[in-house]
Amino acid sequence: MDIICTPLGIISTVHPGQGILDVTASGFQNILLDLSVFCSAGELEWLGNDQEKLKETTRPLKILISEHPTELYNTIKPLLKQYKKACLRTPIAYAPFLLRNTKRKDLSETLYCLALESIRCCDKSGSQYIIIKPLFSGIKREDVWNVNRQFYLRLGKEAKKHDIKILLENQCQEINGHLVRGICSDADEATFWIDRLNEEVGEERFGFCMDVGTCNLCGQNMQEFILSLQKRIKAVVLRDCDGYRESSMLPFTCSKFENCGTDWLGLIRGLREIGFDGELILNFSDTASSFSPLLRPQLMQLAKATAEYFKWQIGIENLLKENKSIVLFGAGNMCRNYMKCYGEKYPPLFTCDNNPKLWGTEFCGLEVKPPESLNTISEDCMILICNIYYREIEQQLRDMGISNRIKFFSDEYMPSFYFDRLERG
């Protein structure tokens, strides 16, 4: 599973050096090739009007990509060179798109040309996937599928030449200032589109990118959404918002009174259930933009850790598969949840606890032993801490001279839960 950082709010296209340094220093190895940065929705909105000032201030080549799509690669080439120098990969790209509330109904062919050139850029940048949003402006609802069918099939021919996969993405639409479900926000519709397109081209050329923020704005059950689309999901955009207004915040930052508005539980459960192992795109552009450049390095480290947390939660069974033998530390609620969800498939040898009253007893079918018993286990046995005092317990075990592999377990996003909690002194 690739973790991919979005450049918005972090990397300037004019002076990208510092942003690239912040990205690589925090441990990111992949960056989204966001081509909409070089041809923004705002630029497209003004296409055909006087944009001389924009040409002078934002384009080193003094041209607008919206007017000259074939110059897209020449425009991004200097940035790609710096990405390569910094050993940053670009596994996935994002094609230019229109504003959600656009007034332009005459740009379908322009968007096609931009998407075509974006696919060609993918071939030169090493990107395997490209996210291309559906056409919507100026199209009657009953014609949306037929218009987009022709749009994507035309692009599919170019994508096949370069062995690039095109990903559709779930959309919101704005009606009188309110965000509601748009094209491909219904999982059944998205499934139909992808399957039909793949059937017509005779191969798996199309897939899906799930935008978590859009699902949240549309008030959707993410687990059901994911289970409907299954393996068609090749990429997931991780971003937080309050469920009412469009924003791209770092996950877990749009919470109130310890409650997250985003359905992270449904997301992780769903992705875990389908065995997701695709592209995990972290978009926290609004969070990044609001922080001082002086704090950016620390923010980037938190962002990387957050993305790694999602990767770990989604693939939690990978951790359990790595070791033939496991011992748990903790004989409480977390241990009970482990045994309920994974005890049969990955049975531990026993569990330990610091509470001497529990030593020699049985808990969830496991013998509870004192921590000192860990000195007798084989070197290849993994110790899995099932207690929220992770780092304190890890330090305790290291101070005891235990050199075994120690990992943490979390029951925050289990397939199922107990509805009661054990209370122990």
Which residues are covered by each model-predicted region?
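N-terminal pre-domain/capping segments
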Residues: M1-Q128, E142, L153, K160, ...
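Generic enzyme active-site microenvironment
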Residues: L32, L167-E169, C209-D211, N216, ...
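Short acidic/polar active-site loop segments enriched in Thr and Asp
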Residues: Q29, R89, Q128, K234, ...
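Active-site acidic/histidine proton-transfer and metal-coordination neighborhood
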Residues: G19, L99-G207, L217, Q298-Q301, ...
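Histidine-acidic metal/acid-base catalytic patches
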Residues: M1-G27, W46, C184-K324, F417-R424
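Active-site-proximal loop/turn and secondary-structure-junction residues that shape catalytic pockets
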Residues: G9, L35-C39, P96-L99, P134-G138, ...
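Conserved beta-strand positions in the central sheet of alpha/beta enzyme cores
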Residues: L32, I92, I131, L167, ...
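Hydrophobic, well-ordered beta-alpha structural blocks that scaffold small-molecule cofactor pockets
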Residues: L299, A303-G425
